[in-house]
Amino acid sequence: MSEMQMDCALDLMRRLPPQQIEKNLIDLIDLAPDLCEDLLSSVDQPLKIAKDKEHGKDYLLCDYNRDGDSYRSPWSNSYYPPLEDGQMPSERLRKLEIEANYAFDQYREMYYEGGVSSVYLWDLDHGFAAVILIKKAGDGSKMIRGCWDSIHVVEVQEKTTGRTAHYKLTSTAMLWLQTNKQGSGTMNLGGSLTRQQEQDANVSESSPHIANIGKMVEEMENKIRNTLNEIYFGKTKDIVNGLRSTQSLADQRQQAAMKQDLAAAILRRNVKPESN
């Protein structure tokens, strides 16, 4: 029964507005307290922003940089609130983490022209893992509000030769838009997508881990954007066009009558008179 409840809960969360995930998640947990831990670990929530007091830069919060009630900043490598003996990446990974944050900072600026990004790395038995977080919220100009949250988790298995590695990418994107215009009223549109991809790639000075991961994330985000555009925006446009028309009812009837007259005229023209 609990497994069926979990499947139904996840299916419901996929269909509810992303901007209300936290509220809906709390409501679901109130209805089914036994699912609390599974729901919290399975449902991606919108990213929250904090500020690094040492560097004065924003960073994003998630389970991967959390230890207790404190969150580690990728810029200073410090926990806020301060925490003794918090989990830290190895020296090698910390160096890679710094490079990755600067690389994806440039990527975010190029593609999103603003927003906040953070990258966190941690050690695994046969390699390491990373999470790339990107958040861009609309400023509300032109009566449009919205937010994009993308979470990319990469598992890297380094081969014994050190020349190749296996990458497993799991990406989730959450997008919502809200328009409020006098002519059309208020409209909400949102959704989320999760996709996976695996590949092997060479590792060298000219093709390091950051470049390989960056290429996978870039390709995945482009695929997700195209899918969201086709499914959510394309289908919504078709539905709205089917519900509303720019023509008046009188014009539609006149156009239909004209089509019938043309069809009848063509039919009469094609019918040959019988010969005596």
Curated annotation (Swiss-Prot):
InterPro entries: CapZ_alpha/beta, CapZ_alpha/beta_2, CAPZB, CAPZB_N, F-actin_capping_bsu_CS
Gene Ontology terms describing biological process: actin cytoskeleton organization; actin filament organization; barbed-end actin filament capping; border follicle cell migration; cell morphogenesis; microtubule-based movement; negative regulation of filopodium assembly; negative regulation of JNK cascade
Alphabetical keyword list: Actin capping, Actin-binding, Cytoplasm, Cytoskeleton
One Gene Ontology MF term: protein heterodimerization activity
UniProt-annotated location(s): Cytoplasm, Cytoskeleton
Function: F-actin-capping proteins bind in a Ca(2+)-independent manner to the fast growing ends of actin filaments (barbed end) thereby blocking the exchange of subunits at these ends. Unlike other capping proteins (such as gelsolin and severin), these proteins do not sever actin filaments. Forms, with CAPZB, the barbed end of the fast growing ends of actin filaments in the dynactin complex and stabilizes dynactin structure. The dynactin multiprotein complex activates the molecular motor dynein for ultra-processive transport along microtubules.
PANTHER family referenced in this protein's UniProt entry, alphabetically: F-ACTIN-CAPPING PROTEIN SUBUNIT BETA, F-ACTIN-CAPPING PROTEIN SUBUNIT BETA ISOFORMS 1 AND 2
Protein name according to UniProt: F-actin-capping protein subunit beta
UniProt organism field: Drosophila melanogaster
Gene: cpb
